[in-house]
Design a protein with these regions (language model features):
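Active-site loop/lid in soluble adenylation, ligation, and acyl-transfer enzymes
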Residues: 1-98, 211-239
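Short, charged/polar micro-motifs that form catalytic or ligand-binding hotspots
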Residues: 39, 43, 131, 155
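Conserved metal-phosphate-binding beta-hairpin within the catalytic cores
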Residues: 53, 152-173
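Intrinsically disordered, low-complexity acidic/polar segments
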Residues: 62-63, 164, 178-180
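Anionic ligand-binding catalytic core segments
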Residues: 67, 77-125, 169, 173-234
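A long amphipathic alpha-helix within ATP-dependent nucleotide-binding catalytic cores
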Residues: 119-153
């Protein structure tokens, strides 16, 4: 799925993908188990910001809005309902936490300061590019997804710098692991929405707090099914 989106958005920003064909990869990866599951990429210096964009109000954003009328410090119109589409997508960056810790939501101004620590003299420039690329990518991909019957409620991008210092999108892109995908059919604000992403598994875990964090096989199978359905709707291909 990342390859699909990388190919679609090359006009906005370059990506780190070199090839998904195992024949192009080192000999060790030229095995059946890696075919279709691997991507060879350029090495990047990753930027220490999680670039989150929200087109609809849901999840932690909804919880924050109910309490404060804001999401990550951004004031939103009064009277929004859960799952409402926002007037414009909002950019809500966070820091990248160490493994085991939680990412911290920060303002745009704080992202400038944070980046300046790692890239002296480039904090403002990099923060603006992260924000602008994030919004541009979301708008293009959300419009396409909607034409295929899927709402991208929110997502996360990660960017890095190549050897020349140019910004490149890396990691994965617009998969069900980093995005909320809702079916457009039956979309109705005022409550949570069914989804084609990991929220299904999360909801089961929340409903079963005494579980030992082992998902039953039927929940695993249903989650896989939702991932596949989202992929097939978006790409028109079957796996």
């Amino acid at each position: 799925m990342s390859k699909f989106w990388f190919d679609m958005t090359e006009d906005i920003i370059p990506n780190h993908m070199i090839s998904v064909d195992v024949k192009d990869m080192p000999e060790f990866f030229q095995q059946e188990k890696f075919d279709g599951n691997s991507m060879m990429c350029r090495k990047l210096e990753m930027l220490p910001i999680e670039c989150i964009v929200r087109g609809y109000i849901t999840g932690s954003g909804w919880e924050s809005y109910k309490k404060t009328g804001k999401v990550c410090g951004i004031e939103l119109p009064e009277g929004l309902k859960e799952s409402d589409k926002l007037p414009e997508p909002i950019y809500t960056p966070s820091t990248k936490a160490e493994i085991g810790d939680h990412d911290e939501n920060i303002s745009f101004e704080q992202s400038v300061t944070h980046l300046e620590k790692y890239f002296p003299g480039r904090g403002q420039e990099l923060a603006e590019k992260l924000r602008d690329n994030t919004i541009a990518l979301y708008k293009k991909c959300a419009e396409y997804a909607l034409s295929k019957g899927i709402i991208i409620a929110d997502t996360k991008f990660e960017f890095g710098l190549d050897e020349e210092g140019n910004m490149v999108i890396g990691d994965e892109m617009l998969t069900p692991d980093s995005s909320r995908f809702w079916p457009a059919e039956g979309y109705e604000p005022g409550h949570g929405q069914p989804s084609f992403d990991k929220q299904f598994a999360r909801d089961w875990l929340k409903a079963n707090p005494d579980n030992d964090w082992t998902l039953p096989q039927d929940i695993v199978d249903k989650t896989i099914g939702k991932y596949l359905q989202g992929y097939e709707m978006l790409t028109g291909k079957k796996l």
